[in-house]
Amino acid sequence: MTRNIVLAFTISWLGIIFSFAQNTPQIKGVITDVDTGEPIPFVNVYYEGKAVGSTSNMEGEYSVDNKAAIGWGKLTFSSVGYATQVVQINSSTRTLNIKMRPDLILSEVIVKPKREKYSRKNNPAVELMKKVVNAKKASDLSEKDFYNYDKYRKLTLSLDNVQTNDSLMSSMFKKYPFLLEQVEVSDVTGKKILPVSIEETASEILYRKDPKEQKTIIKGINSGGVNELFNTGDMLNTMLADVFQDINIYQDKFRFLQNPFDSPVSQSGIAFYKYYIMDTVYVDTDKCFHLTFVPNNPQDFGFTGHLYVLSDSTYRVKKCVLNLPKKSDINFINSLSIVQEFGELPTGDWVLQNDDMVCEIAYMKSLSAVQVRRITKYRNFGFDPLPAKLFARKGKEIKDVNAMMRDDSFWEEYRPEKLTKAESGMNHFVDNLRQIKGFKYIIFAGKALIENFVETGTKDKPSKIDIGPINTIVSRNYIDGLRLRASAQTTANLHPNLFLKGYYAYGFKDKKSKYNAEVEYSFKKKEYLPREYPIHSIAASYMYDNMSPSDKFLSTDKDNVFTSFKVVNVDQFNYERTAKLKYQWEQENGLKTTVVLSHSNYEATGRLFYRTMSAQSAFEQNFSTLSPQQWERSPYDTKDYTTTEITLGVRYAPGETFINTKQRRVPISLDAPIFTLQHTIGLKALGADYAYHLTEAGIYKRVWMGTWGHIDTHLRGGIQWSKVPYPLLIMPAANLSYILQDGSFNLINNMEFLNDRYASLDMAWNLQGKILNRIPLLRKLKWREHLGIKMLWGTLSDKNNPFLPENKNDAMLMMFPGHYLENGTYQYSSYLMDKNRPYIEVSAGIHNIFKILHVEYVRRLNYNHLPTANKWGIRFMIRTVF
């Protein structure tokens, strides 16, 4: 969730600050068959030689920006089976309806009229594409024993479609002339843009076939713009790089916009796309077949576009143009164009040389759009054997220690073309932005909202201490009542290896102070935060606070004001006092090792109490002598218990990538599998009361179902091997708030089931609107379906079962949690599970409501006879996805 909220907020924030009053005028119309009057879908509407245009929808409707004012006076309409039309336009043209005449013969290739049903059988376009797919292995560089090449990438973020002649903007440019100086004309769209951020990366790609390995050596990084206003500004560039990943059309599938796409040059693509031969044309000096392609369903995740294939026996792709269909179900994207150009090396090898992407993004149509431009150049290819030492360094991506400090001479060598005036003056532009009256308050608010922290520094004196998280300042719970908290953490500006953080909280109901202090030493220097990848650190902490047993399952801070509102009354707490020493070592291959030594004391509070079975026997014998207040706080109770633990954990997530926020590190590549294994040893040392062994393991995997979305699966299991009282048994991960949280049960109460062996399955299916997109009244809403099922198997062995007669007077086992009713009856709130009857809850929901809201109806299917059971509920969360 967080990773896309960052990008969505940035887009909205830029749109609000620089939102301009008027948009470029549009030309709209309907394209029909001159003979039948029927609408013609998938007609290409474009300005010749320009990457600006659109495609008609199923009703033959189209819209395109009017570019006559900048000299683009001719609009071209082309479609297989129809004669191409070129129409003269002027700046006043608003409506343009087109009648197209069938033309069955197109440049040596006979095709069937468009109005006939598309067939892949005996289709010359499909037969040609099969030859292209069969020949692509000959152009696959991964078949080489070795290769290396230089890669240059420039990623520019700009405000799109700037109206310099608008009255509102004229006054703004007059007041702030540096804004006008920053405006330039896009060489692709012809629109006026205002660049606000740029990042250049120069790298070398190394590859060997046996053993197969590829490494990226980042030699230089040059970054500037509004992202520099944020100390975690790398979030924006990291997100953009993940969303707009490089595309290899020779792969069967590739990841783009955080979704898998079928390549038009693949076996699966032949089934996914419709292909049409348009003409034979020359690209540079090479004669090529010109093909167009469209998805079978324009709302599925696929491209429309053009392929230019050499008209010789090699069937190599000379040029590829990818566009996103107007009716695509992808959020935020107004338009997208990718142009890839291939060429032959002196060695005869065929390689990608230029990759140019332009994307226009807007969170809302009422806000100005943002243009993302990515230019990638590939050069200096080599195929000689590479020394083994080049592959000895760990990690797929290795950053040169001087990458961020390259001078102008370096960039003159690696930069294939000069920066524009606006791009080269980005730092000066940001300095001018800082001088705008009130701008610092906008940045302050933006930082607080995005980062959830308030900085204490300035531009000249970067923040050494950040105050936050902000959303934990005020919260409430059963013990504290109203709770106020002050938190802070140091940054690498104070020390690049040593970090401090902590909080002080006060509860107005129990009138007690709570606190936490932590010191962490990182063995690697950090740019800002200790959590930056990869982690290699040791930390010591001391905490005293009240905790509900279910708090440990929260993915957010327990004092998060939004999750402090519970669906049930949570009144069973501990006062927890914990001293902890934690060592973490994370390797570039995705393997993370954690060792934790902790010493904790738990004192029951609220309506939680600890009473051994032997003490319960004495309690029952003397029940009549006790007052109701003593039923849950009797002289027979165990006031507290103490543990000393050593925990060893291993986590393996190959290919996982992250963005760093000031509160936590957020994974942005959810396709990576995750394997976890953890063993905890309880030692009867340092005053601890129990000795035990606990083992838990887990697996996560996302499986894509083609056009039917994806299924996320979590499988977990664990065993408490020893005889222990109930606080040390295994309780389900219960989510007691209204906010959805991954990996937890929505309708299980606090400690509702206690087991010493368990297995759980959590499956969530995001259908990506596959069904709702086919319902006419709902299609335009772009709602997406979500189905889920959560299951829990659990059992309690005899040695840990306090309900068995042989354990009635046991001095270690404790009676399960519950509450005394007014008549003195004890009602349990924790229960045993039937090992042959798993707990099941299902959910059905809709997300992408207003592009941001996810709502689910959850239903509990069994164990509803329990007095504390909640049969159903409504849960929600903020979630933005493409």
List the model feature ranges, each with a label.
Residues 51-61:
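Short, acidic Ser/Thr/Gly-rich low-complexity loop/linker segments typical of extracellular
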Residues 32, 44-46, 78-80, 94-141:
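Short, acidic, small-residue-rich periplasmic hinge/interaction motif at the N-terminus
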Residues 43-47, 75, 111, 149, ...:
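Hydrophobic beta-strand segments
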